[in-house]
Amino acid sequence: MMQDVSSSPVSPADDSLSNSEEEPDRQQPPSGKRGGRKRRSSRRSAGGGAGPGGAAGGGVGGGDEPGSPAQGKRGKKSAGCGGGGGGGAGGGGSSSGGGSPQSYEELQTQRVMANVRERQRTQSLNEAFAALPKIIPTLPSDKLSKIQTLKLAARYIDFLYQVLQSDELDSKMASYVAHERLSYAFSVWRMEGAWSMSASH
């Protein structure tokens, strides 16, 4: 019986069954490979989608991050520009500070010279006003201010002009020769009211 079974030929149905059983086993690895490819492709697509987004996010984050190299360079440049501006301002301050003592000294010298000129002018005026009462005939009771002294000098000049232009110049020339007599005549002329009238004008 064993010889019959071993020697019996295999039927085509059994071959087809065995082949059909082997074919699914052979076909399974390709399906697994395809699934792996799909999974890999899906992972790649997901990674690629995340990649640009991550790159974009990284780009934005890199722009916002203070420690990025680009911003560090910009910060250094701005700091350098600010330092240069500060240096320029410092230089301007030093130049102005160097020029300020000269201008201050010039102003001081100008003020001193102006004060000297004002003192000289005041001194000369005081000397002139002190000399006028010696020339103009005055009364012992006169306590004249500078303006009154000037008015009295103007009236004395007017009196002398009237004396010189009078019709009786020849007959009265001898009586007005001496300075004392002129002074007396002027004093009388003042007391008669001419001085008060001229002072009122």
Curated annotation (Swiss-Prot):
Region (Disordered): 1-106
Ranges annotated as biased composition (Gly residues): 46-65, 80-100
Gene3D superfamilies: Helix-loop-helix DNA-binding domain
Pfam families named in the record: HLH
Amino acid composition bias (Basic residues), ranges on this chain: 34-43
Keywords for this protein: Activator, Biological rhythms, Developmental protein, Differentiation, DNA-binding, Myogenesis, Nucleus, Repressor, Transcription, Transcription regulation
Protein name in UniProt: Twist-related protein 1
Species of provenance: Pan troglodytes (Chimpanzee)
Top-level taxonomy: Eukaryota, Metazoa, Chordata, Craniata, Vertebrata
